[in-house]
Amino acid sequence: MPCIQAQHGSLSQCAGPCDNYVPDILNSEFGKFTMDLVNSEIAASTSLPSFSTFMDGYTGEFDAFLYQIPSSNQQSSLKVEEFQVFGCYPGSFTNQLDETMSSSGSDYYGSPCSIPSPSTPGFQNPQLPTWECSYGAYSPTQNYDNMRHWTEQQKNSISQQTFFSFGTPAHSPNMAANPLKIAPATHRLDQQLVDTDVFALAQNSSAGFPAVPLGQAPGVLDSSVLLDSPLSPSKTRSPSSNEGRCAVCGDNASCQHYGVRTCEGCKGFFKRTVQKNAKYICLANKDCPVDKRRRNRCQFCRFQKCLVVGMVKEVVRTDSLKGRRGRLPSKPKQIAESSPVDLINSLVRAHIDSIPSSSKLDYSKFQETVPLQLEKESSVDVQQFYDLLSGSLEVIRKWAEKIQGFVDLPKEDQDLLLESAFLELFILRLAYRSRPEEGKLIFCNGVVLHRTQCVRGFGEWIDSIIEFSHSLQRMNIDVPSFSCLSALVIVTDRHGLKEPKKVEELQSQIINCLKEHIPSSMNEQNRPNCLSKLLGKLPELRTLCTQGLQRIFYLKLEDLVPPPPIVDKIFMDTLPF
């Protein structure tokens, strides 16, 4: 068996009566402890650190310390022949014994030291007492003869640190009840500790030594951390653990993707499928195996397994968010609320800028009487009808862009609102500008035509427009009220809006402006129910719009003149059926 021996300095002669009993202490029968090392890990051989790592720079005197540990891979017992302690340890014990003596001051402590061995009759192995110094009480055996050297004080002693401490180990089911444990204490050269102890023999223990973590490396024994816990094997991850595996195919996975721990391959497959809205078909029974080797065989089953394990489609960024990691779609801009005065002023300005001035009206084509012609419309009349409609569309578009808050809407919503309300705005603006009593129709480009000049192109629709113009002008609506009414025609809920909430907010602002303006503009006779009468014109406009669509449809069937693309698009988009 290997023998590990460490000796520091020379044996110094202690001052006092303790000198007489040094041979007894050096006796090989000083202590015999029987301990069973049932754990193969404890019985394994190990290398312990040299005492020079602890005692560098020490200038005091030392005693000898020798111990032997068997190096057998089999379970063995450590007996007195295999574990022998010779001599004393660095420092002196006598200075501390006065502190640990009982209050009774037993005379037994004054007797010389003689520890019986297992071969002596006075030795009782099962009832081994406790041995402590400055940190506990020491009771060797019931025979206290020759123990006086424990009570003798040594003068001019040098207190040193404890290099090994023995304590009661925590119970471990994998280890023997009394394994050996050697714990290195902190080795510091810049301070000296007083009242240090050397050994503490545990009570209720046949051996008195706690567990030795012999499986630890020498570097661990050199550390300043006391190895107070019993040896326990390090936890290792079981091969069957699913941690770090892809939940879809079982490949290696380092982190979570879309809510589930998946590999990079399944992450990319799931992302591409969701972004492209791909549809897969299983050629088998929709139960194809999906693993690392066969995950590319059936895309349908692979995607279904992605959904089953919990991958979330909503987390995948869409095409509009590519390259914008960590950024969410910006919140839609709310319509900036302005004061009613500012809003109504902007509406009036937009209306005035979109109508021809009285000094620029074009009467070159105006004729009160026309020669008798056939009731059948001609291509010239139809072309004139289309030109008036398409010319009004561009004027109305420019007018709508000047409405405060309209340009803040999405471009798609602007086009949808304009095309849906075009015919209604054409009728309303024509009815407000015209002079129905004189039979004059003033169009937005400044052209003035008589009613008889428009009958063959507009048909009966023109009569309905003139009748509506009569009823509208009898209400004596001022320009601010009419400007608000025109804005309400285009700013209203339509099917297919992307942001109907913003349209609704702008509509509410316009209605509030109209409510605040009407009481100050109308006289007392016209003030009651004026707002309801004014808003009641909106359903009439819807009816007139339907008649206009019917007229366009009729002219398309006649096929005398093909309609302009913009008129044809508006017709097809605004059909109620």
UniProtKB/Swiss-Prot annotation:
Keywords: Cytoplasm, DNA-binding, Inflammatory response, Metal-binding, Nucleus, Receptor, Transcription, Transcription regulation, Zinc, Zinc-finger. InterPro entries: NHR-like_dom_sf, NR4A1-3, Nucl_hrmn_rcpt_lig-bd, Nuclear_hrmn_rcpt, Znf_hrmn_rcpt, Znf_NHR/GATA. Residues 339-574 form the NR LBD domain. A zinc finger (NR C4-type) spans 246-266, 282-311. PROSITE patterns: NR_LBD (PS51843), NUCLEAR_REC_DBD_1 (PS00031), NUCLEAR_REC_DBD_2 (PS51030). Residues 243-318 bind DNA. It comes from the Eukaryota. Its cofactor is Zn(2+). One of its GO terms (molecular function) is zinc ion binding. Signal peptide: none annotated. Residues 247-333 are annotated as: Required for binding NBRE-containing DNA. Residues 500-523 are annotated as: May bind lipopolysaccharide. The keyword Protein transport does not apply. One of its GO terms (biological process) is non-canonical inflammasome complex assembly. Orphan nuclear receptor. Binds the NGFI-B response element (NBRE) 5'-AAAAGGTCA-3'. In the cytosol, may detect bacterial lipopolysaccharide (LPS) and NBRE-containing mitochondrial DNA released during pyroptosis, and play a role in non-canonical inflammasome activation. Belongs to the nuclear hormone receptor family. NR4 subfamily. This is Nuclear receptor subfamily 4 group A member 1. It comes from Xenopus laevis (African clawed frog).
